[in-house]
Structures are given as C-alpha cells and as structure tokens.
Swiss-Prot record:
Snake venom phospholipase A2 (PLA2) that shows a moderate inhibition of ADP-induced human platelet aggregation when tested on platelet rich plasma. Exhibits moderate hydrolytic activities and prefers the anionic micelles (dPPC with deoxycholate) to the zwitterionic micelles (dPPC with Triton X-100). PLA2 catalyzes the calcium-dependent hydrolysis of the 2-acyl groups in 3-sn-phosphoglycerides. It comes from Trimeresurus stejnegeri (Chinese green tree viper). Its EC number is 3.1.1.4. It holds the Pfam family Phospholip_A2_1. Keywords: Calcium, Disulfide bond, Hemostasis impairing toxin, Hydrolase, Lipid degradation, Lipid metabolism, Metal-binding, Platelet aggregation inhibiting toxin, Secreted, Toxin. The active site is at H47, D89. Its cofactor is Ca(2+). This is Acidic phospholipase A2 CTs-A3. The lineage of its organism: Eukaryota, Metazoa, Chordata, Craniata, Vertebrata. GO terms for molecular function: calcium ion binding; calcium-dependent phospholipase A2 activity; phospholipid binding; toxin activity.
Length: 122
C-alpha cells in the first residue's frame, strides 16, 4: 500500500516519501511520462514499471507483509502479488537512499509536465 511505501522510505532512505518524492521530476508522484530527469526520478520510473508488472492485486491499496532482519527489509507472506509489491517498494526505497547525493529539490520539485513529453518504455 502507499502507506507502507511511505513507511519503507522513512525506514530505508530516512526521508518522507510524501514530502520528498510525491511531486519530483517526471515520474515521482501520480502517473509519469517522459525521460527520467535524474537518478532519483529514475528510481520512480523503475518503481512505476515494477508496479506495472504486478498482476492480481492493487499495489497502491493492498497491504503486504514484511519484517526487519539485521537492518534489512524482508518481504514475506503467502500472496505472490503482494510480495512482489513489497519488493517493488523495497527496491525504490533503497534506490532513493543510494541516490540521496544527487537529489535536487530546487531543480526537480514540481517539475513542469511540459518537460516530460517523450516517453521511454519500461
């Protein structure tokens, strides 16, 4: 679920997903099109593609199971769809953490959609 995604971002990247990634670049936030603008925006592009491959559940609403083991997030549960959503969220949170040094709020926050025209395939 989006609430769990926010929680994973806080745990892994130590930032608020809502305040840092909900309207960033061409892909962070609702929807997405165009070229990813920087490594953080690419994290969101890959996350969108990951959600697009998930079938059988609603990635934004369904609750998944995970645990923390030795500082790592471990996705669990019996539902393969929900587990896949967890893996998508975990990968994005790690990507955000690993690209914090190139995050550019001033340049890409509320980035104009007119600059996000030429889409790329997943």
């Amino acid at each position: 679920s989006l609430i769990q995604f926010e929680t994973l971002i806080m745990k892994v990247a130590k930032k608020s997903g809502m305040f840092s990634y909900s309207a960033y670049g061409c892909y962070c936030g609702w929807g997405g099109q165009g070229q990813p603008q920087d490594p953080t925006d690419r994290c969101c592009f890959v996350h969108d593609c990951c959600y697009g491959k998930v079938t059988g559940c609603d990635p934004k609403m369904d609750i998944y199971t995970y645990s923390e083991e030795n500082g790592d997030i471990v996705c669990g549960g019996d539902d393969p769809c929900r587990k896949a959503v967890c893996e998508c969220d975990k990968a994005a949170a790690i990507c955000f953490r690993d690209n914090k040094d190139t995050y550019d709020w001033k340049k890409y926050w509320r980035f104009p959609t007119k600059n996000c025209q030429e889409s790329v395939p997943c």
